[in-house]
From Swiss-Prot:
SS bond partners: none
Localization (cell): Membrane
Entry membrane topology: Single-pass membrane protein
GO function terms (MF aspect): heme binding; iron ion binding; monooxygenase activity; oxidoreductase activity, acting on paired donors, with incorporation or reduction of molecular oxygen
Any one GO biological process: trans-zeatin biosynthetic process
Main location: membrane
Entry annotated with the keyword NADP: yes
Family classification: Belongs to the cytochrome P450 family.
Tissue: Specifically expressed in roots.
Job of this protein: Cytokinin hydroxylase that catalyzes the biosynthesis of trans-zeatin via the isopentenyladenine riboside 5'-monophosphate (iPRMP)-dependent pathway. Can use isopentenyladenosine-5'-monophosphate, isopentenyladenosine-5'-diphosphate and isopentenyladenosine-5'-triphosphate as substrate.
EC number: 1.14.13.-
Protein name: Cytokinin hydroxylase
């Protein structure tokens, strides 16, 4: 009798849980999207008709396959139709504001800069990353700062901020100079030969972030870089299937490989962490070090910020990805632009030698005087921003300009389209013209957002800009760059904007 009663209770609990999951799934995949769609239609905002479960993903995929199927016929920068063909098509059909569907997740496209400013500043506390975004990167960078929301984001931002103080940045500069010198010496041996500069920049920035994040464990940091590069690609591919309920639990090829690589990445991180902890425990070292990992371990040891090992690993993965990926691409595209615009290359070289001397090694204090270089970097970030879009989800109903944004609606800010807008930048918006950052003072405007904007802007942007200036100043003073005849201009998007075939340059060492 008692056994029967227990079984009945268990059955009731199980059925209740099943019904709860079923109800939540129906709300998530059908009722909430339908409610948001009707709510926005009443405000006059429509968009392409979504398919069941997949939304507009198939349509976007077809457009991207067509637009990026061929290389560019020449080196030009009118890349919005190539990388955002769906934006170009639907903005013409539905206007500046339209709703598109990433599976069952509705996304409002927004390009009006005043509203974007309001969203990223005033409404920052009640917006953030969506569930789909978090799931798409969970296997890659976990719950680090990049994907955190609300109190978790504030907590992690506060935790990471000491790593980017002015004094710490000065300390990082020596690693940047040292690593660049070693690379330059190696490149000097390849006189007149073609160099895939993108691969060189990936190695260089991975070396720098390994030293600044892991210090004496930088060799393992380089191994970690290789694993994270593969893991990033797999997660980007697996994200396409997240619109299907339960897809992340299926034993698919992508899911198995992601799980295996994630385990290997975290094993390697644990080795680095355990090595630091052992050194302190046996008295070989008096602290965990002054790099990012040491800073986090010191906070955990002193019971600050409620840190645990998993949080430290997620932050390490996050900063490793953001700390080398975006900067290596910035350097790659900037060197391509300088090689394609020799007059600006000469201007920057003359400025570097005048400010920094013949060896071209800048001090941190001299970087602000490299105005031509700064303009070139900003123009590179405008034409080829690290990411094509900036997403935010509303966690409660908000008033944005003349719109009411309902809870659960994601807002999709097409950064690339804004950076290339003739309306905002003039008729030469698709041309390389660094002078625009002098005459029009756009560097600090709401039209320019390579590192996002508002309280949630990129915490490492000062680090990235310092690194880019040091590396470019040293390289341009030691080499001249020319585009190789083998270079094929074909930008693509794999989370970030990348050159499909790399960037082949011919380097010529300069006699000093």
């Amino acid at each position: 009798m008692m056994v029967t009663l227990v079984l009945k209770y268990v059955l009731v609990i199980v059925m209740t849980l099943i019904l709860r999951v079923l109800y939540d799934s129906i709300c998530c995949y059908f009722l909430t999207p339908r409610r948001i769609k009707k709510f926005m239609e009443r405000q006059g905002i429509t968009g392409p008709k979504p398919r069941l479960l997949t939304g507009n993903i198939i349509d976007i995929s077809k457009m991207l396959s067509h637009s990026a199927s061929n290389d560019c016929s020449s080196i030009h920068h009118n890349i919005v139709p190539r990388l955002l063909p769906h934006y170009v098509s639907w903005s013409k059909q539905y206007g500046k504001r339209f709703i598109m569907w990433n599976g069952t997740e509705p996304r409002l496209c927004l390009t009006e800069t005043e509203m974007i400013k309001e969203l990223l500043t005033k409404h920052n506390p009640v917006t953030g990353k969506s569930w789909l975004q978090q799931q798409g990167t969970k296997g890659f960078i976990g719950r680090g700062l990049l994907m955190a929301n609300g109190e978790a984001w504030h907590h992690q931002r506060h935790m990471a901020a000491p790593a980017f103080t002015r004094d710490r940045l000065k300390g990082y500069a020596k690693h940047m100079v040292e690593c660049t010198k070693m690379m330059a010496e190696r490149l000097r041996k390849e006189v007149g030969e073609e160099v895939e500069i993108g691969e060189e920049m990936r190695r260089l920035t991975a070396d720098i972030i390994s030293r600044t994040e892991f210090g004496s464990s930088c060799d393992k940091g380089k191994e970690l870089f290789s694993l994270l590069t593969v893991l990033q690609r797999l997660c980007a591919q697996a994200t396409r299937h997240l619109c299907f309920p339960g897809s992340r639990f299926l034993p698919s090829k992508y899911n198995r490989e992601i799980k295996s690589l994630k385990t290997e990445v975290e094993r390697l991180l644990m080795e680095i962490i355990d090595s630091r902890k052992d050194s302190v425990e046996i008295g070989r070292s008096s602290s965990y070090g002054d790099d990012l990992l040491g800073l986090l371990l010191n906070q955990m040891d002193s019971n600050k910020n409620n840190l645990n090992v998993q949080m430290i690993m997620d932050e390490c993965k996050t900063f490793f990805f953001t700390g080398h990926e975006t900067t290596s691409l910035l350097l790659t595209w900037t060197l391509m632009l300088l090689a394609h615009n020799p007059t600006w290359q000469d201007n920057v070289r003359d400025e570097v030698r005048q400010v920094c001397g013949q060896d071209g090694v800048p001090s941190v204090e001299q970087l602000s005087s490299l105005t031509s270089l700064n303009k070139v970097i900003n123009e590179s970030l405008r034409l080829y921003p690290p990411a094509t879009l900036l997403p935010r989800m509303a966690f409660e109903d908000i008033k944005l300009g003349d719109l009411i944004i309902p809870k659960g609606l994601s807002i999709w800010i097409p950064v690339l389209a804004i950076h290339h807008s003739n309306e905002l930048w003039g008729e030469d918006a698709n041309e390389f013209n660094p002078e625009r950052f002098t005459t029009r003072s756009f560097a600090s405007s709401r039209h320019f957002m390579p590192f996002a904007a508002g309280p949630r802007n990129c915490i490492g942007q000062t680090f990235a800009m310092m690194e880019a200036k040091i590396i470019l100043a040293m390289l341009v003073s030691k080499f001249s760059f020319a585009i190789s005849e083998n270079y094929r201009h074909a930008p693509i998007v794999v989370l970030t904007i990348k050159p499909k075939y790399g960037v082949q340059l011919v380097l010529k060492p300069l006699d000093l």
